[in-house]
């Protein structure tokens, strides 16, 4: 689910459009004619507007009827906790006091899923003020202070890129990028992410996979590799969604022979967070070596296991990096025992950082730890590239 908060005169397809109740703001279910009038897409945000010119905006926005899907605002977003993939807000935060902005960001953190996107678009107060100083044009005064046609028309909080980043990052979000300015006046839109577990493909530095290479993803799980030509798993439920999208799927146990695959059929084999679950990693390594020419194996480090509830993971092995960086990682049978980092109490149960509900830790600690995890996740895994043959060492 995607939320478009403060939708105003823009009805975005693919989003749940949210705005405050007002005399000329109607619900979409009651006014499908207004939906048709104002609907557009994110990449054509102002396509239905004739008033977005400097001369017309001098008099304020046109007095027309608008539409949204549900009434609401940032004080109480109409969405369950951890249910939202993206929140887009254009020219709303400047209408909030800084205290209200902090509450709004708390709400965003509450409803966004881990790795959810937050996009905030506001006027560029620094650049606008400079233009007003240079020209004296009242249009830039309006851009600074707001249209001031009613109580909600005032700009209460000016922002620069630095100040917006500071307030959003204070709530644990991670800055991703600045998006292109879609306005004809100074403004900026910053994109943030709510930290969480990421797909390893998003942080592991892979060598370039040449076009034309045939790629196999073993154990795709929640994050199937988009570059893969085929996906292998013993669990049919993990493969069904991929099969329905026309992907080649191979139901097989990688510890077996996998007769569906020919010798050295795949130019590159991607295997992330699978080997630690297997009873016989040596057998799996032999099969992978037979069907693949090269690849990467990603497994959690022993330190990472120590930060989480190891007993809940179903991992059968702890994996230690080999002192010789070019040599295979060492698999040590876990037997349910993992050395914990006991001197940092809050890290004994790192999985709670990514969990919603009454059992989660204090929000401030949750945010800081979640952000730390996100920014350092690549350091918490053992990444092993192999060529011709995948070797592993096993210590019982």
Go through each PLM region and give its residues.
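Conserved alpha-helix/loop element of class I SAM-dependent methyltransferases that forms part
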Residues: 198-213
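S-adenosyl-L-methionine-dependent methyltransferase catalytic module, highlighting the catalytic core
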Residues: 60-62, 97-113, 117-198, 259, ...
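Core dinuclear metal-dependent hydrolase active-site scaffold
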Residues: 4-8, 206-208, 218-220, 235, ...
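Conserved SAM-binding loop
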Residues: 3-130, 164, 190-195, 211-304
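Short, solvent-exposed coil/turn segments at beta-strand boundaries
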Residues: 1, 214, 323-325
């Amino acid at each position: 689910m995607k939320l478009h908060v403060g939708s105003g005169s823009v009805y975005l397809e693919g989003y749940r459009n949210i705005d405050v109740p007002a005399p000329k703001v109607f619900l979409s279910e009651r006014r499908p004619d207004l939906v048709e009038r104002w609907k557009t897409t994110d990449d054509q945000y102002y396509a239905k507007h004739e008033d977005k010119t400097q001369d017309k905006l001098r008099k304020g926005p046109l007095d027309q009827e608008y539409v949204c899907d549900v009434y609401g605002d940032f004080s109480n977003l109409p969405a369950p906790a951890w249910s939202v993939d993206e929140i887009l807000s254009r020219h709303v935060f400047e209408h909030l006091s800084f205290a209200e902005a902090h509450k709004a960001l708390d709400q965003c953190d509450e409803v966004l899923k881990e790795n959810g996107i937050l996009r905030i678009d506001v006027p560029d107060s620094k650049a606008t003020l400079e233009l007003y100083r240079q020209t004296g044009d009242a249009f830039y005064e309006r851009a600074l202070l707001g249209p001031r046609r009613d109580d909600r028309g005032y700009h209460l909080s000016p922002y620069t890129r630095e100040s917006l980043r500071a307030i959003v990052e204070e709530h644990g979000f991670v800055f991703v990028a600045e998006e292109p300015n879609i306005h004809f006046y100074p403004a900026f839109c910053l994109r943030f992410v709510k930290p969480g577990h990421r797909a390893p493909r998003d942080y592991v530095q892979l060598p370039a996979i040449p076009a034309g290479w045939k790629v196999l993803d073993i154990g795709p799980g929640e994050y199937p590799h988009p570059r893969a030509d085929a996906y292998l798993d013993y669990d049919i439920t993990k493969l069904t969604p991929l099969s329905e999208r026309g992907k080649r799927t191979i139901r097989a146990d990688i510890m077996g022979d996998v007769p569906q695959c020919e010798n050295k059929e795949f130019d590159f084999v991607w295997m992330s967070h699978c080997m630690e679950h297997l009873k016989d990693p040596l057998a799996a390594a032999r099969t992978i070596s037979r069907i693949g020419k090269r690849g990467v194996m990603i497994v959690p480090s022993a330190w990472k296991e120590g930060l989480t509830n190891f007993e809940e993971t179903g991992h059968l092995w702890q994996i230690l990096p080999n002192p010789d960086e070019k040599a295979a990682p060492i698999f040590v049978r876990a037997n349910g025992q993992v050395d914990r980092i006991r001197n940092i109490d809050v890290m004994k149960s790192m999985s709670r950082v990514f969990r919603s509900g009454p059992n989660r830790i204090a929000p401030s600690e949750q945010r800081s730890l979640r952000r730390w995890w996100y920014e350092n996740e690549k350091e918490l895994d053992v990444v092993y590239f192999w060529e011709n043959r995948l070797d592993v060492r096993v210590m019982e």
